UniProtKB/Swiss-Prot annotation:
One GO term (biological process): translation
SUPFAM superfamilies: L35p-like
This protein's name: Large ribosomal subunit protein bL35
UniProt entry tagged with the keyword Ribosomal protein: yes
UniProt KW Acyltransferase keyword: no
Protein family per UniProt: Belongs to the bacterial ribosomal protein bL35 family.
Keywords per UniProt: Ribonucleoprotein, Ribosomal protein
Disulfide bonds: none
One GO cellular component term: cytosolic large ribosomal subunit
Gene Ontology MF terms: structural constituent of ribosome
Length: 63
């Protein structure tokens, strides 16, 4: 049986730590002038994949 290949798009979007999978925030690319400083600051912090999606992301990353 051939080796499983990592989904390259997923590899660029997720980082795997000890127990959690880190992801980037949405709503941070453009047209940020309408958004308050507080909202932008909160979106800057680390985000983690929800537990319902962890298995699917791990499968894409071959973990």
């Amino acid at each position: 049986m051939p080796k499983m290949k990592t989904v390259r798009g997923a590899a660029k979007r997720f980082k795997v730590g000890k127990n959690k999978i880190k992801r980037g925030s949405a709503f941070r690319s453009h047209i940020l002038t309408k958004m308050s400083q507080t909202r932008k600051r909160d979106l800057r912090g680390p985000q983690f994949v929800d537990k319902t999606n962890v298995a699917a992301v791990k499968k894409m990353l071959c973990k």
